[in-house]
């Protein structure tokens, strides 16, 4: 049994589950015996219910130009409140929200932004939402505009961002990371400046991310992503994860959570053309036999060349066979249903190969 919530007159398929994460026996969840009474008690507690009504309910416009009431999902409620509480405490200056794609991170930022703007003890803060693509900028701006969030501005160019920061504007600012290109250190040293970075696994370890941090040395920095990276040259956990947070993140909503809540469709993988898969074990054996009589230096050079899997992936024979299989599969299973399909290739050259084939 599960508890679902939704606004009045919302079709049942758009209702979402309300859960208490990490507050019950996981076996009970698996068996479908979770404590619905406990969830109802939590949801209808005056502090929770009033919080949702005041900060986590918005009116938006649907595709038919009709006003609809939108109520938060539980992961948006928990994630946004985690950000708000961290800012109010003021001790930890960053945090990572790791929520799977399609789980509603744009609305999470909206809920967090409007709640922080209304907290008197935060002293009229500035909330910045930073994206790294024009389409994301337009998408998030449209989300805020549709919900008629007050005191929200966007930046059309670098100068506008500079003016907003230098004049100490106290609003919700939506901007792109690229507009920090010409900022200078200590551009705004205020403490109650909160930055939420969408798709936080990109651009943050490079020059633009460093420029932003240098320009806003005392700001709170929160990263939101569905795919954090943990590599030497790119590390989302280093950029946003706080040492105090378990596993480096302050809130997580996984792919499995999203499937369970019907927020995301399941992903099915069908292996095809096994003769064209990479047999690493036999490849390693063949390489050792071939390299036996080579010097160490020549062996290293050969290894570097052999490691370039693109040579194999882009061989004309392989591309031709795969394209033939794609066309047959598309015409038989995809096109009759009126759907489209996408081909993912190793690089641009391969993309041209597949298109021409």
Predicted regions and their residues:
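ATP-dependent helicase/translocase motor core
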Residues: 1-128, 135-150, 168-172, 190-192, ...
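Conserved helicase ATPase motor motifs in RecA-like P-loop NTPase domains
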Residues: 101, 201-202, 215-232
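Conserved helicase motor
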Residues: 131-134, 154-163, 177-182, 346-348
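Residues immediately C-terminal
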Residues: 136, 179, 199-203, 229-230, ...
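Conserved motor-coupling elements within RecA-like helicase/translocase cores
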Residues: 158-173, 186-187
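SF2 helicase catalytic motif II
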Residues: 188-220
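Interdomain helical connector at the RecA1-RecA2 junction of SF1/SF2 helicase-like NTPases
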Residues: 234-338, 355-356
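Conserved helicase motor "Helicase C" RecA-like lobe of SF1/SF2 P-loop NTPases
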Residues: 348-357
């Amino acid at each position: 049994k599960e508890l679902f919530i939704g606004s009045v007159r919302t079709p049942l398929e758009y209702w979402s589950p309300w859960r208490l994460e990490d507050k019950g026996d996981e076996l009970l969840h698996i068996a479908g015996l979770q404590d619905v009474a406990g969830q109802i008690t939590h949801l209808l507690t005056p502090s929770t219910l009033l919080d949702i009504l005041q900060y986590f309910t918005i009116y938006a416009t649907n595709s038919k130009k009709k006003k609809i009431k939108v109520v938060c999902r539980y992961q948006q409620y928990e994630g946004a409140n985690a950000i708000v509480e961290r800012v109010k405490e003021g001790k930890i200056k960053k945090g990572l929200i790791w929520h799977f794609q399609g789980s509603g991170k744009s609305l999470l930022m909206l809920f967090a932004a409007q709640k922080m703007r209304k907290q008197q003890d935060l002293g009229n803060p500035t909330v910045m939402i930073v994206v790294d693509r024009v389409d994301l900028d337009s998408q998030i701006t449209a989300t805020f505009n549709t919900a008629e969030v007050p005191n929200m501005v966007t930046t059309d160019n670098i100068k506008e961002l500079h003016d907003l920061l230098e004049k100490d504007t106290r609003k919700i600012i939506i901007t792109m990371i690229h507009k920090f290109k010409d900022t200078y250190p200590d551009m705004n040293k205020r403490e109650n400046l909160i930055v939420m970075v969408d798709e936080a696994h990109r651009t943050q370890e490079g020059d633009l991310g460093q420029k932003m941090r240098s320009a806003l040395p005392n700001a709170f920095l929160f990263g939101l992503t569905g795919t954090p990276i943990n590599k030497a040259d790119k590390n989302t956990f280093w950029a946003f994860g706080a040492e105090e947070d378990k596993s480096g993140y302050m809130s997580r909503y996984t792919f499995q959570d999203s499937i369970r809540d019907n927020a995301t469709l399941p992903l099915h993988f069908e292996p095809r053309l096994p003769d064209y898969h990479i047999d690493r074990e036999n490849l390693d054996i063949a390489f050792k036999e071939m390299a036996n009589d080579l010097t160490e230096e020549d062996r290293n050079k050969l290894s570097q060349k052999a490691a370039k899997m693109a040579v194999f992936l882009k061989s004309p024979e392989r591309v031709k066979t795969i394209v033939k299989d794609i066309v047959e599969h598309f015409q038989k299973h995809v096109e009759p249903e009126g759907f489209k399909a996408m081909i993912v290739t190793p690089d641009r050259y391969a993309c041209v190969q597949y298109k021409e084939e």
